[in-house]
Each structure stands twice: as C-alpha cells, then as structure tokens.
Amino acid sequence: MGYKDLKFDKDSVFLVTGGAGFIGSNLCEAILNLGYKVRCLDDLSTGNPKHVEMFEGNPNYTFIKGDIKDLDTCMKACEGVDYVLNQAAWGSVPRSIEMPIFYAQNNIVGTLNMMEAARQNGVKKFVYASSSSVYGDHPGLPKKEGIEGHVLSPYALTKKTDEEFGRLYKTLYGLDTYGMRYFNVFGRRQNPEGMYAAVIPKFLKLLLKDEAPTING
C-alpha cells in the first residue's frame, strides 16, 4: 500500500511542522498531491524556504512562520486541523551533546506544546518524529519495539521523552498519537553538506566523486 492509496475526508486539513525541512517538505508535497489542505509551520532555523516555494500559489497550501516552542503559535496553527504531522525538531547526535539544554527546549518542550495544542483543538491523529536512537545501547538485532537499552545522547533522550509524552497523552487525554522511529531516512531535498549531515547522503556524495567513504566499526 502506497501513500496514494490513503483516503481521508475530502475537506481534511493537515498541519506539517518542520514542513520546510527534508522530511516535512516531502510530506507537504505528498499530501498536496492527494488533494488535501496543508499548513506548513516552520521557523526556518534549519528548514529551507526553497523546499516549499514550489507550493506557493496552491490554494490548498498555507505557510506559517513560527516556532513550536511558543504555545500560542502552536494553538493558532492547530485551529481547524484534522491531522498533525510533527516533524519540527533539531537532529544530530553529536550536536545534541554540545547543546543539551537547547535540544531539550526544542525537541521536548516544542513537541509537548504541539501535543497540547492538538489536544485542545480536537485533532484526530498526532503523528510525530521519533528516532531509532531510542534503542540506545541494546545490542539485539533486529530492533524491536519494547526492547530498548539506555539512550546514549541528549538527542535520543529527547525522542524517548517525546514517546513517553505521546503515550501519556493517549492514555490520559485520548489524543491518538503515533511515534515514527526513523532509521537513516534519505531522499530528495536532503542536505549532504556540513559536519552534521546524515550518513547515507554523505556516502552518496563521496561515491559520486569516486571517493571512498569511511565506515567505522
């Protein structure tokens, strides 16, 4: 089953946070291609406005520049929304080790703000970005939900905390939450540059230049 087989009410409204990012912009594009309304919320701190400029002029698309750390912004963005796809977060394990407080503010408080705004606005489903990093130091393969070790970075801890809040919001308030544990996602509009770039685009960039990638381990 592909995304084109998904069916929602014809007037459904989706809010994509971090919508100008790599994953978020692809979600915006897919939903617009299905004919549904999309609101893109992004503060453009890491998102690229060029990723979403192609949607300008589409009557089903609205861009909101705002920060999920601000609850009022989240509340307004969720008004009249049916589905939230929360992708807004700061990535990179190494950078989180350098900036643990900043990561907690963005990835935990920001996601909690979005869950609360979704709850108060009667959102039907709340899907958020978690990470494979929540499996921590558990050596078992393949990875399985419910079998996790100790997390190894502030970034992983923010995602594990998000999952706990997601579980509580479902149990206590009935918000239908789903966390997606991404494993090295790659695709269009991903940035292969910089010291914090993901491993797959880094490898591809080197291979395209006929250079050997370094594999640790």
Model-flagged regions — what are they?
Residues 57, 192-196:
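Residue-level signature of the cytosolic catalytic core of signaling kinases
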Residues 110, 141, 192, 213-214:
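Short, polar/charged, Gly/Pro-enriched helix-capping and turn/loop motifs at alpha-helix termini
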Residues 96, 146-148, 175-177, 181-191, ...:
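A conserved pocket-lining segment of Rossmann-fold NAD(P)-dependent short-chain dehydrogenase/reductase
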Residues 153-154, 196, 210-211:
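Short, charged/polar low-complexity linear motifs in solvent-exposed/disordered segments
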Residues 1-185:
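N-terminal Rossmann-like NAD(P)+-binding domain of SDR-like oxidoreductases, especially those catalyzing
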